[in-house]
Amino acid sequence: MRIIETVAEMQAFSREARREGKSISLVPTMGFLHEGHASLMIEGKKRADILVTSIFVNPTQFGPTEDFDAYPRDLARDRNVAETAGVDVIFAPKASDMYPRGFQTYVNVEELTRPLCGASRPGHFQGVTTVVAKLLNIVLPHVALFGKKDFQQLAVIRRMAADLNMDVEIVGMPIVREADGLAMSSRNAYLGPEERKNALCLSRALATARDLFLDGERSVGTLRDKVLRVIGEVPGAVIDYADFRDGDTLETVETANGRTLIALAVKIGKTRLIDNCILGEEQ
């Protein structure tokens, strides 16, 4: 496995690989890799000759009061996870290389970034789309893989790639969960033992609403009330949003169907966690 730390070297590597007729897959990450990331890498390995994983804690997607400095970093651990999953190249650039002096160009997707995380984290998605656009231009992948836990992010990146005629396939992969249902996330490392137990309210609320839907309930108001009640029973759980949206457009809905998205953002202690499900899809 090769580690590349500069934009110039990564671009040269990718151009040479393409000249040789090799296909490239990319799994963009912020590091502190877990089994959810590994599942993306394993799929990426199947889809291309060369699998690249980027590890870059992107400063432009963090707000001034968010956890950029505290975000967990462990490159040695990440190397082990990546190598085990079959990664060929780790691209781990420095912020000064990705955003050199004088940088002033940003990518912004309009409508899709306004609700949900876009409403509670101003500027977040501009940072996400900008860094992903840069990674796609640098690595030149034929396919890029993202987890569906960040459902809105996936929708935004797909929109950006389509709108800007980017010659890359964007693939969304299922949420990977712990045995007790908690969605895998690098931020789970922040949780203390009691908070870890309380964090199960997200997946429990989703499962409860989905069971009601499968039993025939279609009223979003009724389903939302149930979600709020399940989370509200947990001490210290603070809801950022518990929203029902169309799974394709992210527009609000009043009547649920199989493509309805339930999207949650909940603070457990100081840790903000997100989770989601599509009501008609198996979890």
UniProtKB/Swiss-Prot annotation:
Major localization class: cytoplasm
Listed CDD domains: PanC
Catalytic site: 37 (proton donor)
Domain of life: Bacteria
GO terms of molecular function: ATP binding; pantoate-beta-alanine ligase activity
Chemical reaction(s) catalysed: (R)-pantoate + beta-alanine + ATP = (R)-pantothenate + AMP + diphosphate + H(+)
GO cellular component: cytosol
Cystine crosslinks: none
Amino acids binding ATP: 30-37, 147-150, 176, 184-187
Annotated localization: Cytoplasm
Pfam families the record matches: Pantoate_ligase (PF02569)
Metabolic or biological pathway, per its Swiss-Prot or TrEMBL entry: Cofactor biosynthesis; (R)-pantothenate biosynthesis; (R)-pantothenate from (R)-pantoate and beta-alanine: step 1/1
EC numbers for this chain: 6.3.2.1
Binding site residues for beta-alanine: 61
UniProt keyword list: ATP-binding, Cytoplasm, Ligase, Nucleotide-binding, Pantothenate biosynthesis
Primary enzyme class: ligase
Binding, (R)-pantoate: 61, 153
Gene Ontology BP term (one): pantothenate biosynthetic process
Gene3D superfamilies cross-referenced by the UniProt entry: HUPs, Pantoate-beta-alanine ligase, C-terminal domain
Note: The reaction proceeds by a bi uni uni bi ping pong mechanism.
Family stated for the protein in its record: Belongs to the pantothenate synthetase family.
PANTHER family per record: CYTIDYLATE KINASE/PANTOATE-BETA-ALANINE LIGASE, PANTOATE--BETA-ALANINE LIGASE
Assembly with partners or alone: Homodimer.
Function: Catalyzes the condensation of pantoate with beta-alanine in an ATP-dependent reaction via a pantoyl-adenylate intermediate.
Protein name: Pantothenate synthetase
Lineage: Bacteria, Pseudomonadati, Thermodesulfobacteriota, Desulfuromonadia, Geobacterales
